[in-house]
Amino acid sequence: MSSNVPADMINLRLILVSGKTKEFLFSPNDSASDIAKHVYDNWPMDWEEEQVSSPNILRLIYQGRFLHGNVTLGALKLPFGKTTVMHLVARETLPEPNSQGQRNREKTGESNCCVIL
């Protein structure tokens, strides 16, 4: 499929946690939530074991980061006419940026200061 990608489209190769992959064509105007809904509505037969109950819990991961629902493929500056790899996971909520690290620092009470005598 990836060899015949239209020049105005983006081919996404989605990888599940199980390692199964499937390719889908999208417009640069499609958002992460549009993609999740499309994949849910067109769930591949060989992914049947990983079927989820709702498109709202499908999350895309690109370059190690969760994509929020309103982010478009065009905003990510993905190359047109080429294949881009993303991971697809089922997750109820997205983590807040740096929230866990901040909480850990507050709990320890550690201070990073320097005393000059």
Swiss-Prot record:
Name this polypeptide is given: Ubiquitin-like protein 3
Alphabetized UniProt keyword annotations: Cell membrane, Lipoprotein, Membrane, Methylation, Palmitate, Prenylation
Modification type Cysteine methyl ester: residues: C114
Expression tissues: Ubiquitous.
Location(s), subcellular: Cell membrane
Gene3D superfamilies, A to Z: Phosphatidylinositol 3-kinase Catalytic Subunit, Chain A, domain 1
Record lineage: Eukaryota, Metazoa, Chordata, Craniata, Vertebrata
Annotated membrane topology: Lipid-anchor
Lipidation (S-geranylgeranyl cysteine): C114
Pfam family of the protein (one): Rad60-SLD_2
Lipidation (S-palmitoyl cysteine): C113
GO cellular component assignments: extracellular exosome; plasma membrane
Keyword Cell membrane: yes
Coiled-coil blocks: none
Domain of life assignment: Eukaryota
Main location: membrane
